[in-house]
Amino acid sequence: MMNILLINGPNLNLLGTREPEIYGNKTLSDIEKDLTKVAKEKSINLECFQSNYEGEIVDKIQESVKSIQGILINAGAFTHTSISIRDALVGSKIPFVELHISNIFSREDFRKESFLTDKAIGIISGFGISSYSLALEGIIGYLSSKD
């Protein structure tokens, strides 16, 4: 069975209440339940992890090296600031898809730079909550083609 890790960064635990005009009304728990169901239907084990702390995200990536085949990451604000998360992802050699609910390239200038994009196998941005399912489809397709 393929094992995929979903990582959500800072403030994504506030989905459903935080700026619903940008991020929608679904909670992170709703998203995780829906995505886990889709993954299970495809015989994939999806592990979900959220942290507001950069070091915890780095630790999770490092701990996953032997058990996870692919990562989906919505690093939130860490997308634009975290070299340590970038280094952990690169060092892990686990293929990853960067995802964002909003289109980060159509927002404030500081959100247009990502420390992850050039190392990701792909990026999904701007499709609302559907960005999660699109990213899952993308990583499954990528990993399946590598078998």
From Swiss-Prot:
<dbReference type="InterPro" id="IPR001874">
    <property type="entry name" value="DHquinase_II"/>
</dbReference>
<dbReference type="GO" id="GO:0003855">
    <property type="term" value="F:3-dehydroquinate dehydratase activity"/>
</dbReference>
<keyword id="KW-0028">Amino-acid biosynthesis</keyword>
<feature type="binding site">
    <location>
        <position position="80"/>
    </location>
    <ligand>
        <name>substrate</name>
    </ligand>
</feature>
<keyword id="KW-0057">Aromatic amino acid biosynthesis</keyword>
<dbReference type="Pfam" id="PF01220">
    <property type="entry name" value="DHquinase_II"/>
</dbReference>
<dbReference type="InterPro" id="IPR018509">
    <property type="entry name" value="DHquinase_II_CS"/>
</dbReference>
<dbReference type="GO" id="GO:0009423">
    <property type="term" value="P:chorismate biosynthetic process"/>
</dbReference>
<feature type="binding site">
    <location>
        <position position="87"/>
    </location>
    <ligand>
        <name>substrate</name>
    </ligand>
</feature>
<feature type="binding site">
    <location>
        <position position="74"/>
    </location>
    <ligand>
        <name>substrate</name>
    </ligand>
</feature>
<dbReference type="GO" id="GO:0008652">
    <property type="term" value="P:amino acid biosynthetic process"/>
</dbReference>
<feature type="site" description="Transition state stabilizer">
    <location>
        <position position="18"/>
    </location>
</feature>
<feature type="active site" description="Proton acceptor">
    <location>
        <position position="23"/>
    </location>
</feature>
<protein>
    <recommendedName>
        <fullName>3-dehydroquinate dehydratase</fullName>
        <ecNumber>4.2.1.10</ecNumber>
    </recommendedName>
</protein>
<comment type="subunit">
    <text>Homododecamer.</text>
</comment>
<feature type="binding site">
    <location>
        <position position="111"/>
    </location>
    <ligand>
        <name>substrate</name>
    </ligand>
</feature>
<dbReference type="GO" id="GO:0009073">
    <property type="term" value="P:aromatic amino acid family biosynthetic process"/>
</dbReference>
<comment type="similarity">
    <text>Belongs to the type-II 3-dehydroquinase family.</text>
</comment>
<comment type="pathway">
    <text>Metabolic intermediate biosynthesis; chorismate biosynthesis; chorismate from D-erythrose 4-phosphate and phosphoenolpyruvate: step 3/7.</text>
</comment>
<comment type="function">
    <text>Catalyzes a trans-dehydration via an enolate intermediate.</text>
</comment>
<dbReference type="InterPro" id="IPR036441">
    <property type="entry name" value="DHquinase_II_sf"/>
</dbReference>
<keyword id="KW-0456">Lyase</keyword>
<feature type="active site" description="Proton donor">
    <location>
        <position position="100"/>
    </location>
</feature>
<feature type="binding site">
    <location>
        <begin position="101"/>
        <end position="102"/>
    </location>
    <ligand>
        <name>substrate</name>
    </ligand>
</feature>
<dbReference type="GO" id="GO:0019631">
    <property type="term" value="P:quinate catabolic process"/>
</dbReference>
